[in-house]
Amino acid sequence: MHLENLLKSLKNTVKKLKTYNFGVSMWKVNIGRLMHALNAFKGSKPLFETDEMLMVKGVCRDEEVEKYGSIKDYLVKKLEKEGFEIVEDIKEIDKFVSRINEILKENPLYPDTFGFERMKESFEMIGCECDYVIAKKRNIMVGVCMYFDKKMKNPKFVEVVGVLLPS
């Protein structure tokens, strides 16, 4: 009888673990879909990955980029099409930044939001076009950045930082 209870308990624990692992990794599918929507999945590489954070870099091959007035307009449309809500509220953005710092176990390095503005300025100083958008979908927040040389226009690099927010 004792052995049966122990086996039953063990089965329940394994079942819970399988459910947890499925849930933890499934959120990353949204990041993959986003990279597909940007036509940047092929050849993309994870720069950093944990159960709660994923940073991916790829090259956007989407010819539609040129049809938009700006990088930001393009990214907003792609994110909205994938079911993300654009985040502009500073408190929400601060939650995103705090979550990144919590996962990386670091103190904030920049006075502005995750250094996005500083990064954008740095790219612009060396002759690149650059912009970013922060968005949310359920318990996932992402920062998506695109940059490219203003003269050559290609390649168009895309970086996505995605975090899983606590429930």
Swiss-Prot record:
Domain of life the protein comes from: Archaea
Pfam family, one: DUF2120
Official protein name in the record: Uncharacterized protein MJ0491
Species the sequence originates in: Methanocaldococcus jannaschii (strain ATCC 43067 / DSM 2661 / JAL-1 / JCM 10045 / NBRC 100440) (Methanococcus jannaschii)
